[in-house]
Amino acid sequence: MNGTYSYGTGRRKSAVARVFIKPGSGVITVNNKPVDEFFSRETGRMVVRQPLELTGNLDRFDILVNIHGGGESGQAGAVRHGITRALIDFDATLKPVLSNAGLVTRDAREVERKKVGLRKARRRKQFSKR
């Protein structure tokens, strides 16, 4: 990686994304694969491009992402969070636009643990009156 990169770390559920952006032609690479190949679902691709579309920078930056952990949805959210932070690192004037869209805040929702005596986190065994 040569040149000047702006960096942002994104997290969502158990996924962690390290995002590097630099001025370029709009190529997004996730774990050495094009974004359209890495995220098989269209929703994942839309989530990843959301901060770029919102700020009008879709074709202005080359983005390199290293991601591990989590599933497809969590990884897409982590990449979005990382791109948002990297854009703010590159140009702080974009922060109000991204903040109003709710992209700067880390989504703190995590999977609730399974409790002893229950089937799942909150699901109880069926109650039989007789």
From Swiss-Prot:
Gene Ontology MF terms? RNA binding; structural constituent of ribosome
Per its UniProt record, what SUPFAM superfamilies does this chain match? Ribosomal protein S5 domain 2-like
Tell me the domain of life: Bacteria
List the keywords (alphabetical). Ribonucleoprotein, Ribosomal protein
Keyword Ribosomal protein: yes or no? yes
What Gene3D superfamilies does this protein's entry cite? 3.30.230.10
Gene Ontology cellular-component terms for this entry are: cytosolic small ribosomal subunit
Protein's GO biological process: translation
Q: Into which family does the record put it?
A: Belongs to the universal ribosomal protein uS9 family.
Q: Which NCBIfam families does the record cross-reference, listed alphabetically? A: PRK00132.1
Q: What is this protein called?
A: Small ribosomal subunit protein uS9
From which organism does this entry originate? Nitrosospira multiformis (strain ATCC 25196 / NCIMB 11849 / C 71)
State the encoding gene: rpsI
